[in-house]
Amino acid sequence: LISFKSNTMSSATAVIPRLHHLKPVNLVALNPQDGQRYGLAHGDIVRITTPGGQAQAQISLLHGVMPGVIAIEHGYGHKEMGAAQHTLDGEPMAFDEQIKSGINLNELGFADPTRQVANTWLDWVSGASVRQGLPARIERV
């Protein structure tokens, strides 16, 4: 599983309603060969499971994704930044449920399955979170 930057969503743009209208959820893509191998069609709903979590999404089959890879667009599925109801001095603040839409890649987790304690899975070469190589399983819902 890899992630890629969105052309519309980021932490700075997640609160813009017009962008959510144009693209309400993030793209989850597979190569068409993988779709055929797993009996998946463009638009199917799938469950993606990693060592750190799972999520459901609608898939797109795209030739630009390398076979064997699940590609998820980063920048969706926010839990705050106006997505949750809060109060200030007893007054409810405005919020927008749409900001929650899509998969938050962080919720698929970067938990290291090789450790006995909760720990972030780090790339041994770069020392960064394993964001571009999470092992994942995909199945039709």
Identify the role of each PLM range.
Residues T13-A29, Q33-V141:
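Long, contiguous, secondary-structure-rich segments that constitute the structural scaffold
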